[in-house]
Swiss-Prot record:
Protein name per the record: Shikimate dehydrogenase (NADP(+))
GO cellular component, one term: cytosol
Reactions catalysed, as given in the entry: shikimate + NADP(+) = 3-dehydroshikimate + NADPH + H(+)
Record-annotated active site: K65 (proton acceptor)
Organism field: Photorhabdus laumondii subsp. laumondii (strain DSM 15139 / CIP 105565 / TT01)
Any one GO molecular function term: shikimate 3-dehydrogenase (NADP+) activity
SUPFAM superfamilies reported for this sequence: Aminoacid dehydrogenase-like, N-terminal domain, NAD(P)-binding Rossmann-fold domains
Family affiliation: Belongs to the shikimate dehydrogenase family.
Database matches in Pfam families: SDH_C, Shikimate_DH, Shikimate_dh_N
Subunit structure: Homodimer.
Xref: PANTHER family: BIFUNCTIONAL 3-DEHYDROQUINATE DEHYDRATASE_SHIKIMATE DEHYDROGENASE, CHLOROPLASTIC, SHIKIMATE DEHYDROGENASE
Enzyme class of the recorded protein, top EC level: oxidoreductase
Length: 272
């Protein structure tokens, strides 16, 4: 049986194996899917070992998306633009194709939630692989984007990298202190450690919506912080996770599974 896995650090919390189990059951396409904790400095070695053992497809989560981008022999257009890869597929010629399904996963979920409209002003918090993976579809959708990051130079670099696609305003965290945004997206990994980004509470208001690309059974730290400061419409990244996984599954198998029933099952399991 073909082997697939998610690579990350940490990875114990990952719902990806459960999602792909549900996709396999739904489509009748069986595949073995596991999760692999990869030492921070051993991504290349872990990937080579997995491929030698019969692996043909990998999902990549933090902090390895940029390394997967470098490792891929071929890239889809959305992966090339983002500079980050969350899905690898071993081709028949033994070359690795790198894709990024994060953006389509996020956009699909934002549309499902009715969180996004054309012309909206969006603040993206974070400038790593997760943030870069979602910028292309948001720009294509017609959104106005501001990006901020703890290391401001990275926000500037990301804005410059996407200048051919659309205008992104880089802003220092310390100067963001007014409620000018329609949608605020946390694309940092701060929630994994129970932390929040170092942002001003004054960016929130009762009219903006918040989305955390991190997910957990309870409210994420970022969403709890936003709620405390007046936000009443919010969501975590579980829907995005299922959406990006569906498009990874399509890359590997040529079939796009239904997202809604899998998302419903996961929500029920998390609540219980």
């Amino acid at each position: 049986m073909d082997q697939f896995a998610v690579f990350g650090n940490p990875v114990a919390h990952s719902k990806s194996p459960r999602i792909h189990q549900l996709f396999a059951r739904q489509t009748g396409i069986e595949h073995r899917y596991g999760k692999i904790l990869v030492p921070i400095s051993k991504f290349q070695e872990a990937l080579d070992t997995f491929l030698k053992q019969g692996g043909i497809g990998v999902n990549i989560t933090v902090p390895f998306k940029e390394q997967a981008f470098i490792r891929a022999n071929e890239l889809t257009e959305r992966a090339r633009l983002s500079g980050a890869v969350n899905t690898l597929k071993l081709l028949n010629n033994n070359q690795l194709l790198g894709d990024n399904t994060d953006g389509i996963g996020l956009l699909t979920d934002l549309m499902r939630l009715e969180f996004i409209t054309q012309g909206q002003h969006i603040l993206i918090i974070g400038a790593g692989g997760a943030a870069r993976g979602v910028l292309f579809p948001l720009l294509e959708f017609g959104c106005k984007i501001t990006i901020t990051n703890r290391t401001f130079s990275r926000a500037i670099q990301v804005a410059n990298n996407f200048s051919a696609i659309g205008s992104i305003r880089p802003a220092e965290m310390k100067v963001l202190n007014s409620p000018e945004f329609d949608l605020i997206i946390n694309a940092t990994a701060s929630g994994i450690n129970g932390e929040i980004p170092t942002i001003s509470p004054f960016i929130f208001n009762e009219n903006c919506v918040c989305y955390d690309m991190f997910y957990q059974a309870n409210l994420t730290p970022f969403i709890s912080f936003a709620r405390k400061h007046g936000v009443s419409r919010y969501a975590d990244g579980l829907g995005m996770l299922v959406g990006q996984a569906a498009h990874s599954f399509k890359l590997w198998h040529g079939v796009l599974p239904e997202i809604s029933p899998v998302l419903l099952t996961l929500e029920q399991e998390l609540r219980s």
